Swiss-Prot record:
Belongs to the UPF0391 family. Keywords: Cell membrane, Membrane, Transmembrane, Transmembrane helix. It comes from the Bacteria. This is UPF0391 membrane protein Bxeno_A1464. GO terms for cellular component: plasma membrane. The chain crosses the membrane at residues 5-25, 30-50. It is found in: Cell membrane. Pfam families: DUF1328. It is a multi-pass membrane protein.
């Protein structure tokens, strides 16, 4: 359990460095683009699955 706490602490420190630095603004733009790409991929695979039946 202490191992998981240490891992989450390290992840929180890394997230804080990115959040309080200037990297977060660029990362949000990349995340928005990736979100829409994966939504399109999801819809295409969903339609292919429906058509297959």
């Amino acid at each position: 359990m202490l191992r998981y706490a240490a891992i989450f602490f390290i992840i929180a420190i890394i997230a804080a460095v990115f959040g309080f630095g200037g990297i977060a603004a660029g990362a949000t733009e990349i995340a928005k683009v990736l979100f829409f790409i994966f939504v399109v991929i999801f819809l295409v695979t969903l339609l292919m699955g429906v058509m297959r039946r």
